[in-house]
Structures are given as C-alpha cells and as structure tokens.
Regions:
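Extended, regular secondary-structure scaffolds
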Residues: 115, 120-228
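Glycine- and charge-rich intrinsically disordered segments
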Residues: 1, 242, 249, 253, ...
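Extended, charged amphipathic alpha-helical segments
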Residues: 200-343, 384-387, 392
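Extended, helix-rich architectural segments
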Residues: 1-140, 460-461
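Extended, non-catalytic structural segments that build the interaction scaffolds
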Residues: 30, 37-51, 55, 285-320, ...
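Long, highly charged low-complexity segments enriched in Glu/Asp and Lys/Arg with interspersed Ser/Thr
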Residues: 422-455
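A glycine-biased, small/acidic residue-tolerant capping/turn segment at secondary-structure junctions
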Residues: 365-387, 430-434
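Extended hydrophobic-aromatic, low-complexity segments
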Residues: 326-329, 397-398, 415-419, 428-432
C-alpha cells in the first residue's frame, strides 16, 4: 500500500537524520579516497600550534597508500558476464548491465564498495524500449555512492532488499531534493531552509517492482550486519606511516645539514655592526681567529632511522591489508621462480576472491530485478544465476595457450567450450568464433560426421 503524504514525510525526516549522521562518517573516509589531503589533521593533532611551514611539510608528507590499497582490489574485480543456464537467458540477463553502462562504470562501483564499505545499484522500469524488441521496455539501472543513497534495513543480514532508501540530490543554496523509495513507490520531497519551508511532499509514483528497488553491494559484511570499508579498517596504519614521513620531513627541513659554530669571537657593538659584518661575508670566505677563538660543527640529524621506520609502517599496512608490498613501494621482484611469484600473490588473490563471492549474490539480485522490470518474469525467478569474473591473473599468452591446449587434448573438452577462458576475449567475440567453427568444421569433424552417417544409413550415403 502506498504511504500517505504524512507517513512519507515522517519516514523521510527520520531517514534524513540517519543519512546525515552516516554522511559525516563517510565524508571522513572520502578524504582518503578523494584528492583532499587528510594529513593536516594529523599534523594539528600532533603539534599544538603548527605554523604555515609545518603545515606545508604535512601536506608534502602524505602518500595516498589507502587509495592504492582500494584501487588495487577494485581493478581486479572485472565482471564480464552472467551465467544463467542457457546462453540466450544469460545474454538477456546481462543485457541491462550493458545498455545502462554498468560494465564500463563497474570500477567506480567496486571502488566505492571496497573503500566506503558499501555501494548501491538502483533498478527501475525504464521509459525506452529495445530496438529489436519493440514491446519490451529497458530496465533502468544506475550505481550510487553511499554518500548519495542511504539504505535503511529491518535486518541487513537476512533481508534481500532494504525497507527504505533515501536519495539526496543537492541543490544550490540551502535547498535539498529527496527521493524516498519503498516497496510500492518513489516519493518526491523537497526542503528549502532559506524560506523556512521545511520538508514538503511533492508527489509519488508507483514503480510496481514489489520490493524496494535498491541492491546493496557490501565489502565485508559480518554476522552483525557491519560493513566496514578498507579505509576504515586500515586508516590507523596509513596515518602512522604519514606521521613517520612527517617527522622525517621536519628533520630533513630543519636539521639535515651541519651547523658550523665559532666561540670566543668579539661581539659586535650594535645590531647595525652585526648586520654589516654579515653583509660583508661571502659564501667562499674563510674565517680565522686569535686567542680563545674556536671553530666547530654540529652534526646533521641522520635520516636513516626515519626512512627505515616509514618502510616498516608501509610493510605493516601491506601485511594487514593483504596487499603485495611491491604494490606499495614500487619495488621489483627479481630472481623469483614462477611458483614463488604465484605464492607471493596468494594472499591478495584470497582477498579479491572473497570480495567477488560476497558481491556475487548482489549481482544476481540486480540481474533478477532487472529481468522483472523488463517483464521477463521467468528469468526473475531464476536463482541459478552466477557472476562470471574475468581472469586477471598475470600470465603470458603462451602459458594460457599451453594450458587450454592440454585441457582440450588430454581431457577431451571441445575447443569451443574453452574460448571464454582466453584472457582478453569477450563473450561476444567467443560466440563469434564458435559460430565460425560451426559454419566451418575441421577436416576431422567432417570425416567424423561422414562416418557417423555411414554407420547410421549405410555406405551408400
């Protein structure tokens, strides 16, 4: 049943407060994911009265390691298709992802999921139809950051869809536009604080989806329903690294050279005389003294300890985030066997695989919801849908060809079935090759077909 205007306003007011509280936490995370520099916060906490020079050093000391930790995972999560049984069914369920541009924008979806802890995809019936299916409307799908779309759950662990979703659309000035979603309709609301109008109800539109049309993608949901992002989990080790680099920058800026001293010199009679003597000194002058005059030097601060401490902090971040250390330090691996290289990346593969499994269910839900929006109700009831991820493991084409060739020759797997396993070959290209193979069978296949006909119908065939 569609909510009344009063009920929609009451729900929206509660969700606006909750979403703003969540937004403040996400804004702090966004400082590490966006181009803003969060290190000045560390500097202000570490020093009571920082000056402009130290603030500049704090900005220089920031290394965006958390951006790299998140991006390094998101870049390996490449969704290239859906398996739903028959090829035509799989193609139909994958088509909404393609026509809505989610295939090309999936990196942003995974980046938000891993970085913030969750992201959302909204699915609604569209206004346009497929050119080859005039009677079928396209499903509309779009990905949203949790900063723009807030999902409210009755039970985030057990429920497949949220109870409500609130989309915030910023406007110039102190104005905001909201869209509230439930399992029946979308409610349009607006707020204008400049005119003291508060929150007002505009209209509603039924979407006929039967559920709140939002699919959530979680990073690491536990049994308590918590979904921390990688920034939240690894922020402390990253800040520790920035603090160590900042200390090194201070020592490098103020104490990285020898200080020459002279004692026993006759002091100038006035400040003017002292300034005049300094003005007369040149860089290559040699000073001498008599009597009790002594010259010496104060050693510079050694930076080796700071550099080693920063390396240790970086390595600790790599360990706790299951990130290969060479991905953070730019180092090169040399003199390692193929098996050693595979083992060196094993923890990272486990991490990426876990996130792929966790989000595979959400991909299947989005595919079924899009099928329902397009009127393909049988596909919407297909619970055998699985996500097909691209193999991004670094291998040479010769290694892949050798492995697939052995699968075909030793196990008797038809060559047409392994085309999708070739890196870089899209499902469309693999299908094109299969059609060519069916239209142009090999000599062995033609001979086998002839022999089968002779065995079936006799030698006169």
């Amino acid at each position: 049943m569609v909510m009344s205007a009063t009920a929609a306003l009451d729900v929206a007011k509660d969700l606006i407060g909750e979403s703003q509280a969540a937004r403040r936490e996400l804004d702090e995370v966004d400082r590490f994911l966006a181009f803003d520099n969060p290190v000045d916060v560390v500097a202000r906490k570490a020093h009571v009265s920082p000056d402009h020079e130290k603030n500049a050093l704090a900005r220089f000391s920031h290394t965006p390691l958390l951006q790299l930790v998140v991006s390094e995972v998101a870049q390996q999560m490449v969704l290239e298709g859906i398996d739903a049984g028959a090829d035509d069914v799989s193609a139909a369920m994958w088509r909404p992802f393609e026509v809505n541009g989610l295939v090309s924008r999936q990196y942003a979806l995974w980046h938000a999921t891993v970085g913030y802890g969750e992201a959302h995809v909204m699915v609604l019936p569209g206004d346009t139809v497929y050119p080859d299916e005039p009677g079928r409307a396209k499903a509309w799908m779009s990905a949203f950051s949790p900063r723009a779309l807030f999902a409210s759950w009755n039970d985030p662990v057990e429920d497949a869809f949220p109870a409500f979703a609130l989309r915030t659309i910023g406007q110039p000035g102190k104005k905001s536009v909201y869209r509230l979603y439930d399992d029946e309709a979308v409610y349009f609301l607006a707020q204008d604080d400049t005119a003291n109008r508060g929150l007002s109800f505009i209209q509603y539109r039924e979407h006929n989806m039967g559920v709140c049309p939002v699919v959530s993608f979680q990073n690491d949901m536990d049994l308590e329903g918590r979904t921390p992002g990688d920034v939240e989990k690894f922020k402390i080790p990253a800040q520790r690294h920035d603090k160590t680099v900042y200390d090194r920058m201070l020592a490098q800026h103020y104490n990285s050279w020898k200080v020459r001293t002279a004692t026993g010199l006759e002091a100038p009679n006035s400040d003017e005389d002292a300034a005049a003597q300094k003005f007369k000194l040149a860089h290559d002058d040699i000073l001498t003294g008599e009597g009790d005059v002594k010259f010496g030097t104060l050693p510079e601060t050694q930076l080796t300890g700071f550099i080693q401490a920063a390396d240790a902090d970086r390595d600790m971040l790599a360990a706790v985030s299951q990130t290969p250390v060479w991905a953070l330090n730019g180092g090169q691996l040399v003199n390692l066997s193929a098996d050693a290289l595979v083992e060196a990346r094993s923890m990272q593969r486990l991490k990426v695989g876990q996130k792929q499994r966790a989000n595979g269910r959400s991909i299947a839900k989005a595919a079924r919801l899009a099928s329902f929006a397009e009127g393909r109700y049988e596909d919407a009831e297909n619970f055998n849908v699985t996500a097909r991820w691209a193999d991004v493991e670094s291998r040479s084409l010769a290694q892949v060809a050798d492995a697939l060739g052995k699968i075909v020759t030793m196990l008797g797997v038809p060559p047409a079935l392994v085309l999708d396993m070739i890196p870089g070959v899209t499902p469309a290209k693999a299908e094109e090759w299969r059609e060519f193979m069916r239209a142009n069978p090999s000599e062995t296949e033609r001979l086998s077909a002839t022999l089968n006909r002779q065995l079936t119908y006799g030698t006169n065939v």
